[in-house]
From Swiss-Prot:
Localization per record: Cytoplasm
Gene Ontology BP annotations: DNA replication, removal of RNA primer
Described function: Endonuclease that specifically degrades the RNA of RNA-DNA hybrids.
Family listed: Belongs to the RNase H family.
InterPro entries hit by this protein: RNase_H, RNaseH-like_sf, RNaseH_domain, RNaseH_sf, RNaseHI
Annotated Gene Ontology cellular component terms: cytoplasm
Quaternary state and interactors: Monomer.
Top-level taxon: Bacteria
Catalytic reaction list: Endonucleolytic cleavage to 5'-phosphomonoester
An MF annotation (GO) of this entry: magnesium ion binding
Protein name: Ribonuclease H
Keyword list, A-Z: Cytoplasm, Endonuclease, Hydrolase, Magnesium, Metal-binding, Nuclease
Cofactor: Mg(2+)
Organism annotation: Erythrobacter litoralis (strain HTCC2594)
């Protein structure tokens, strides 16, 4: 399996409001940047979308180190999702899971790969996270 690093971020101008997502893919010396946005969304949806788009950009199954500054994404995919599935997609408070459409997409995107999830502190000088943040912010600006 090829080894790939993915750095993701989401941004929103207002929450909800215009939003964007950014991804930096790295395999060895090769890098690719991806971004996109939506006119009316939330920060959490853009964080999820960034991870989904990053994983879906990989043509073949890969060993992935995915870095995000979103504890929501990391905790959701590594901890909470198991309980949500058991409870029929309701949270511990018996309320429907928010963004369940994107959680389903993320689970599907993750299946093909061996993914290790990493949380990094945002806006803390992590060069690749800063690049993903810039891509997400630029994409959000294009939506407003």
């Amino acid at each position: 399996m090829k080894k790939v690093e993915i750095f993701t971020d989401g941004a929103c101008k207002g929450n909800p409001g215009p939003g964007g997502w950014g991804v930096l893919l790295r395999m060895g010396k090769h890098e690719k940047e991806l971004s996109g946005g939506e006119p009316e969304t939330t920060n959490n949806r853009m964080e999820l979308r960034a991870a989904i788009e990053g994983l879906n950009a990989l043509i073949e199954p890969c060993e992935v180190e995915l870095y995000t500054d979103s504890k929501y994404v990391v905790d959701g995919i590594t901890k909470w999702v198991h309980g949500w599935k058991k409870r029929g997609w309701v949270n511990a408070s018996k309320k429907p899971v928010r963004n369940d459409d994107l959680w389903h997409d993320l689970i599907e995107a993750e299946l093909r790969h061996k993914v290790t999830w990493h949380w990094v502190k945002g806006h803390n000088g992590h060069a690749e996270n800063e690049r993903a943040d810039r891509l997400a912010s630029e994409a959000a600006d294009l939506q407003s």
